[in-house]
Amino acid sequence: RMQDRHEQNFFDMEVETQFSAKAIGITHGARPAPLDWVSADEMHALVSLSQTLHYGVLKDTGEPAGLGLAEWVRGYAVLKEIARERTAAVASPKGYHLVLDRQDVLASLVRCGLSSEKAERFVTLASLHRSARDMFDCPLVPVGSAQLLVFAPALLHLNIVTTVLSNLANRGVQLSRKGKAFEIAMQDFFKKQGLKVAAFKAHRGGEEYEYDLVVAWDGRLFVFECKNRSLSLNDPVAAYYFEQEARSAAGQVNRLADALRQHPDLVEAQFGAECSGWPVIPCVLHSLPYSRSGEFEGAYFTDASALTRFFGEPYFRIKAPYKFGKVMVLHRTAVMKLWKGDKPSASDFIAHLDEPHQVMLAAKHLKIKGFGFELSPTEGATSCELYRLQYTTRSICEAVGADPDEVEQIIADHAKKFGDMQKELKAKGEL
């Protein structure tokens, strides 16, 4: 889902702003962002990283592992552009085997806005080492002291946001601002929806209860335990510990929910006597895209992306762009209604938590594929991996229970209308 979210953000940014045209590349150098952008990937990564962390990366003064987050992004963006340029120049598989002078890589980073010290630091952090997760995080392999072997396939398909977060997580670096920033962002979000919100600490029976976010809504109290943890990113060991953390988080939020049930004066102090006795619904709220269908260990699991999109509009839609000269028109076809009325209700939200369409889409487009490989002339092995099926209008509709024939007809009708409009405008010389 994180990959889906980034791809959708990239698509939306390109359709709405044509931002890729603003990238200047690395050949002639670049000033630090936002004065210059070396690529569309860099622009998209900075926006997505700010959304993920819930604070502006460009304004952040922290230096996790010795680099600012914008410097992390610029470093990977420059490496990705180097890989693109070099592989494009050699039209054969040999183009993917890149051995570069270390000083040339450092010079490119300095020319593109990093100081000499920061360029050295980035090359060190992006170089393969014993505890590195893989060559996507660390695509540089030192060859002696003067050269770098560049793993071009990893760079060409690099997702900068996930790579930065994964590299930092692998080093045990925690972004100190992200936890509190996420809590504040979610509190502010619910307040903007016109709902009663509380965040507080309380003591009862010698125990402390700390509430990140409690929302009073339509006769219910939603207790959210906010989590800003890195995802496992398909690492089996990390996935195991992530699952353990999910169970622990469910236990935490259930404990908080039980305290509100057992001590109604806590509710009265925050929301008034009229809210006392309301049903309490425990939820774990992740900053990164991680939701589950229905309850797990007695709690719902949702995430900021799914939650904000639920409140954003009453429909889940399929988007189709049409270009008129330099103007991009976006047609959106509704395929699923999220609200029963004109505004979201608590009942609608619970229905969403029971069956998040984002999870339904992801699950319907994942398959397990087996493959074999040779270990020696006489031995082999097999393994299984998840792989993604291609999204189509029909597959999306089938995943969420919409009529694919009806939706495809609507899209085809609008495509014809846009095509006729283009022909008419061209005939008049207005396009």
Describe each PLM feature range:
Residues 179, 206-207, 246-249:
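Active-site-proximal structural scaffolding
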Residues 228-285:
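Catalytic cores of nucleic-acid endonucleases
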